[in-house]
């Protein structure tokens, strides 16, 4: 009975190559569909896949056909409604077809095609969602680098554990050794066998010579057989070595206003932004620490669950969060050893006398030590004192950015704007 073992890299997913080719070919349409989809679903569900629809016209294959114009004579069998020179009315748009907007009137005629819909996996979804995004101004600090050791193949070695033995390379060495050790004997054996065959057919018979040749042939065959099939000299083992790969250390501070002026809709949008940010950081950078700070009149460092789901509320003093961040930086994150980033979300409401203090803390303590500080104001109202104070910071510091979010649909575009990967010219 014959057994076939499928060792293809794709395994059970036989169409992986075709799928990857399809994703590359229609990348623009897929990214557009993802941008629309993220505004229609909760960002807490972003860790799953997505059904993507592409207009049928965008995936149609090129084909040869007759050009418009010219004179043609066609015979349509079974026609009992029209005669020559009759005009046929165009089918009403949106009727019967699946490519319409779905907002028109029903119709009894007309044809069309639905959009092409397929499912992309969680990894494919996140790859497209966070493509071309990076932490701005990421630099490798020289004082202390966190070295990650990755295992790399480094040829073969003659010593190792049985689990790493290379069967193919060992058999190749065995064949080469046996060939080298027996090549001369095999040539001599072939010559003796040829001579024996010649003598055995000669007249008169040479019995003594035949006996001598048979004895030498037997001795040569015994010597060849004594050469071992495999020897410890032949064994080769796959060699692996760990190479240090320096990776930059980064910490992201997430500051969120949970004061009484933040209504539930505003808090939800802030939560969505930070959930998106958290997924981006945890997926793109494996060595990024995240510090969560919630604030109203008082600031507190919390864990991830409390940051998103705690019901605590109060007044509004933004400087309390900035002071706490400064304390945490001094205590745990030396700027010479860490790349420090911060993202702050608020509705813009703040005690009027506190806004100048926020400006002072940022200008003198935080912005000189952080790589990038982003401020997101979530409100439909007019900007207040905090926004105006921060505008002065944006004009002075290159590592400070601010954006305005009015609706849920603004979250993803603002997120991409804040963390767009810089080109070489921009970073220079």
Curated annotation (Swiss-Prot):
InterPro entries assigned to the protein according to its UniProt record, in alphabetical order: UPF0229
Ranges of Basic and acidic residues compositional bias?
77-90
Q: Report any Pfam family annotated for this entry.
A: DUF444
Gly residues: bias regions? 93-103
- Region spans: Disordered: 77-111
**Entry's PANTHER family?**
UPF0229 PROTEIN YEAH
What protein family does this chain belong to?
Belongs to the UPF0229 family.
Q: What is this protein called?
A: UPF0229 protein YeaH
Please report the organism this UniProt entry assigns to the protein: Salmonella typhi
């Amino acid at each position: 009975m014959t057994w076939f073992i499928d060792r293809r890299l794709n395994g059970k997913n036989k169409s992986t190559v075709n799928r990857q080719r399809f994703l590359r070919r229609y990348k623009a349409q897929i990214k557009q569909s993802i941008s629309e989809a993220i505004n229609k679903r909760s960002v807490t569900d972003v860790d799953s896949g997505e059904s993507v629809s592409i207009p049928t016209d965008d995936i149609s294959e090129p084909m040869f056909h007759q050009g418009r114009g010219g004179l043609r004579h066609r015979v349509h069998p079974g026609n009992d409604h029209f005669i020559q020179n009759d005009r046929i009315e165009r089918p009403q748009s949106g009727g019967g077809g699946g490519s319409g907007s779905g907002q028109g009137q029903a119709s009894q005629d007309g044809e069309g095609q639905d959009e092409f819909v397929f499912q992309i996996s969680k990894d494919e979804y996140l790859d497209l969602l966070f493509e071309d995004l990076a932490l701005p101004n990421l630099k490798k600090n020289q004082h202390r680098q966190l070295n990650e050791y990755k295992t790399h193949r480094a040829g073969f070695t003659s010593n190792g554990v049985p689990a790493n033995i290379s069967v193919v390379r060992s058999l190749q060495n065995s064949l080469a050794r046996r060939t080298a050790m027996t090549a001369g004997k095999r040539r001599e054996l072939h010559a003796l066998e040829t001579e024996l065959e010649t003598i055995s057919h000669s007249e008169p018979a040479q019995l003594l010579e035949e006996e001598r040749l048979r004895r030498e042939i037997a001795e040569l065959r015994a010597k060849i057989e004594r050469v071992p099939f495999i020897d410890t000299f032949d064994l080769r083992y796959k060699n692996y070595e760990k190479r240090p790969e320096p990776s930059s250390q980064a910490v992201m501070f997430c500051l969120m206003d949970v004061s009484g002026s933040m209504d539930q809709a505003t808090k939800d949008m802030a939560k969505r932004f930070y959930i998106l940010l958290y997924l981006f950081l945890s997926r793109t950078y494996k060595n990024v620490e995240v510090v969560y700070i919630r604030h109203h009149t008082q600031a507190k460092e919390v864990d991830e669950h409390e940051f998103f789901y705690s019901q605590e509320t109060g007044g509004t003093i933004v400087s309390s969060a900035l002071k706490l961040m400064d304390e945490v930086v001094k205590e745990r994150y030396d700027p010479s050893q860490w790349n420090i980033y911060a993202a702050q979300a608020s509705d813009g409401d703040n005690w009027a006398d506190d806004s100048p203090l926020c400006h002072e803390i940022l200008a003198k303590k935080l912005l000189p030590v952080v790589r990038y500080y982003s401020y997101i104001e979530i409100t439909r109202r007019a900007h207040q004192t905090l926004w105006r104070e921060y505008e002065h910071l944006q004009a002075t510091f290159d590592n400070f950015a601010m954006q305005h979010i009015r609706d849920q649909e603004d979250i993803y575009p603002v997120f991409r704007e804040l963390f767009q990967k810089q080109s070489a010219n921009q970073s220079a």
